[in-house]
Regions:
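Active-site histidine-anchored catalytic micro-motif
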Residues: 1-218, 222, 227-327
Length: 327
């Protein structure tokens, strides 16, 4: 019996065509993209109206897609999401954290070049994605350039080559070649699921990001903290989560967290880990900052969005980080 796959086409480069104003999303992809695979799988398409350039994706879009996926999951063997690459890792991470107890594969893919462009990576990425359903995953994953990555920890790492995505902490779940199929499979055994328990993001959730750079005085950042309307802040600090040990900055962090707001400290190093290794990091932890461990920006954004949406406190955020193997 053929597997039934629900295809959610959100937009992105994969289906774009050239217009007088530049590349624009086009629905023509529907008629040809998955036709070569129809002998083995049954596809039902849902084309978002309008199709969205992924740089314009909003929390409302992501919530709408989640609600549609949740409604369709009982009737399908898996979900394929065609998404623009600019924010695909953000969406994948949010899907992964929102869909607790997922027991079917949700595969996201896109391309660096339009489907009809010369030497496009789109046909190969589609072939990889379709083949990934044979692995019977029970999680959200990104299929790109011959590799299947777990959503959590994944990032877009290149705009210049076909190898657009990577997961520097967790690596690939599996690798694919046309003449070998899947190999180097490292999918972990999944725990028994008691059923899907969705945790949807609120479109009104406000999360901000600040990145430390040399010469950007701690005083400037601390002066800005009291005026942030955001409900959670992600701080991209140095190395192991280090920041200036300026007393005013530490006091500002403490005042921010004492308002019940969340401040998550992550490393700006692509393969970094925020932990209180040095005294500066420990001072921030004592002030109420949450060390995000191996959390990358995309995962941190998803985590803080759900934290704000569901009124999580710092202890709950740390519990989630441990469950994600990020601490």
């Amino acid at each position: 019996m053929k597997q039934k796959i629900f295809v959610l086409y959100t937009g992105g480069t994969i289906g774009m065509t050239q217009s007088s104003a530049g590349l624009r999303p086009d629905t023509a992809l529907v008629d040809k993209a998955l036709a070569p695979f129809s002998d083995g799988l049954d596809f039902e398409w849902h084309v978002c109206q309008p199709l969205i350039d992924s740089s314009a994706v909003t929390l409302q879009n992501q919530r709408d897609w989640l609600e549609l996926i949740i409604a369709k999951l009982p009737d399908y063997d898996g979900i394929l999401v065609l998404h623009g690459t600019d924010t695909m890792a953000y969406t994948a991470n949010l899907f992964a954290l929102s869909l607790q107890g997922l027991d079917k594969p949700i595969i996201l893919t896109g391309s660096q070049w339009p489907y009809d462009a010369a030497n496009s990576d789109a046909p190969r990425n589609l072939a990889i994605s379709v083949s990934a359903f044979s692995l019977k995953l029970k999680q959200v994953a990104i299929a790109f350039d011959g590799k299947l990555f777990p959503a959590v920890g994944s990032s877009k790492v290149s705009t210049e080559t076909a190898a657009g995505f990577d997961n520097l902490h967790f690596g690939a779940l599996a690798e694919w070649e046309e003449n070998k199929g899947w190999h180097n499979i490292r999918t972990a055994p999944t725990q028994h699921s008691d059923g899907l328990k969705p945790r949807l993001p609120s479109p009104e959730a406000k999360v901000s990001v600040r990145t430390l750079i040399p010469g950007y005085a701690a005083q400037e950042l601390s002066d800005g903290l009291p005026h942030l309307s955001t409900q959670a802040l992600i701080l991209q600090s140095y190395g192991h989560g280090n920041a200036p040990s300026d007393d005013a900055f530490v006091r500002a962090v403490q005042a921010f967290t004492q308002q019940g707001k969340l401040l998550l400290n992550i490393s700006q190093v692509p393969q970094g880990c925020a932990a209180a290794v040095y005294a500066q990091g420990d001072a921030l932890r004592q002030a109420g900052i949450i060390n995000g461990g191996k959390c990358n920006l995309e995962t941190a954004t998803a985590l803080m969005t759900l934290a704000v949406s569901h009124d999580w406190n710092a202890d709950k955020v740390q519990q989630e980080l441990r469950q994600l193997n990020l601490l």
